[in-house]
Amino acid sequence: MNLSEKSVILLRSFFYLVGLYLLYGFLFTALHNLLPNLDTSSYEQRFIMEMLTENPLRALIMIVIVAPVIEEMMFRSLLKPSHIELVLFVVIWPVFFLLRFVPLDVHWVLKLTFTGVFLFTAVYIGQQLIPRERTLTVRNWLSRYEFLIWIITSLVFGFVHITNYVDHFTINLALFLLILPRILAGFMIGWVKINNKNLPWAMALHAMNNGMAFFFIYLSL
């Protein structure tokens, strides 16, 4: 499959995703009319909204560039993975949790630079410590069960975004409805990864999706 064909899959998937969002919006409105006591307005993405208001440039970089790269390493790297993608998966989760110990008052540019250098170093070390032949069995197993992995990673991807709305993980109908678009996005991004067989394509669709969301949210401020 050449670059042009992969680009068509990317663009087609983006428009399919937009269509799914429109269908979701219609059903969401209908459900609200059927269940007037269903309260979703009490849940807000406070951190994201504050970042958009106080520092739009930071929000743009974090939402459209950083989040797609990091999150695709965490989730879609398990779909038909290459050796380097499996190394990325092994490395990114420990790095992600270690970064939570970085003080909150560290300037975001410095934190982002540190994250990039730290991640690059960790991936390099991971490649040296994990030979290609050692990952072959795992890669073959993951490829064999790609449909199951696709479902699981899409669902987990959606559910981890619950913490956008609440400090601690909890679930109810209102929160499920709020994260449902992330689950839909997870499936479509995974579809692109499976078909284009390369993680950057998944990152690209994720960035396009987040860019669209950023645009509409910023206009609404």
What are the roles of these predicted feature ranges?
Residues 1-7:
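Short, Lys/Arg-rich, polar N-terminal cytosolic tail immediately upstream
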Residues 5, 44-48, 166, 182:
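Membrane-targeting and insertion segments and their boundary/processing signals
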Residues 8-35:
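N-terminal signal-anchor transmembrane alpha helix
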Residues 12-14, 41, 151-157:
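Short acidic/polar alpha-helix capping motifs at helix-coil junctions
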Residues 26-39, 85, 218-220:
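Membrane-helix interface motif
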Residues 37-55:
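Perimembrane loop-to-helix junctions flanking transmembrane segments
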Residues 49-69:
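Interfacial helix-start motif at the membrane-water boundary
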Residues 62-221:
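Transmembrane helix-loop-helix hairpins at the membrane interface
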